[in-house]
Amino acid sequence: MSLLVMLATIGACLPKPLSESGGGGGVNITLYGFSIMKEPLEKAIYPAFAAKAKREHNIDIHFTSSFAGSETVTNQILQGVKAQVAILSIERDADRLKQGGFVTSDWHLLPQQGIVNKTPFVILVHKGNPKSIHDFSDLAKPGIRLIHPDPISSGGAQWSILAMYGSELLKSKRDSGTEDRTRALQTLQAIWRNVISTPASAREARTTFELGNGDALITYELDGLLMRQGNPKADVEIVIPETTILSEHPAVVIDRNVSVVDRPVINAFMQYLWSDEAQREFVKFHFRSTTNEALNQENKELATIKYPFTVNDPLIGGWSRAYPEIIEAVFRDQVQKRK
């Protein structure tokens, strides 16, 4: 069903005074998202979708939203908040919502298998890069003070762990033809010994670093670009690791909280997220489009990654393997507990 047809269906579902005049308070969409989705949604995506509905069908669309670490958002929904849509940092959180009975539809049937945008993981350092940090492995050097979000509450933190561990696996395979999991583990252990603060979300970690704490921060590329954009004189440089992961972010409908009347509204908004108009807005906020590579070329600040990889790389195995085998068995059991 096209977006125009969906919007027309919305009008048909509304009481006539509302659909014809735009009065009566309009239609509300409640969205919960992981922390870095706040700016593009509130400043661009929401206003653009609402304007489209008003212009083409005289329907008033309003949004209510809340943003936190992906694990926190997922827990809030599981505990009963009435979110209708969630945009999450990691697919595992979407799986948790499905297992809890909150998501009954298959988000993989959405465009791009439900992945609405992506961004690589990078390292932020202070101007001049005084600690000579050029790759994840440099974060293992003695004396480095690393800010890192908390893997218990932050999906971004879990992406960061996969970035550090996975980059060593891929580098070792390029060096010797075989992945060296011992080397990857030892590097991750050495890096984690240098962590001095674990804020609850990627956005809180960025704030901690902005306030002058630590020598380095592992985060989404877009967060570094937003810092620089907000303050060109900010004490920050972006280090692009030669090998790093592209985080991919699923959008899901919380079916349990969507009424029959609201369904056309939600479906129209979900489809809109993958439109060129919305994808271009994500790119303006330094995400990368999942639908059209040409849109990514419009943002000249997006870095070229020499050896990008995703969670679905055979050495990582997708989230069904990455979480139990790397996040739990490697990080929690052999790194975090032994720090």
Task: Give the ranges of each region predicted by the language model.
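Ligand-binding pocket segment of bilobal, Venus flytrap-like solute-binding proteins
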Residues: K173-I240
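Bacterial N-terminal signal peptides
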Residues: M1-G11
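Extracellular/periplasmic juxtamembrane helices and adjacent flexible linkers that interface
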Residues: R256-K339
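Periplasmic-binding protein-like
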Residues: I115-P120, L185-W192, P199, N231-V258, ...
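Solvent-exposed loop/turn segments at secondary-structure junctions
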Residues: I36-E39, S70-V73, E91-D95, G128-K131, ...
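A conserved helix-loop-strand patch within extracytoplasmic ligand-binding domains
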Residues: K98-K171
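Early extracytoplasmic/lumenal segment of secretory-pathway proteins
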Residues: C13-G100, L109-L110
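Alpha-to-beta junction loops
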Residues: G80-A86, G143-I144, L211-T219
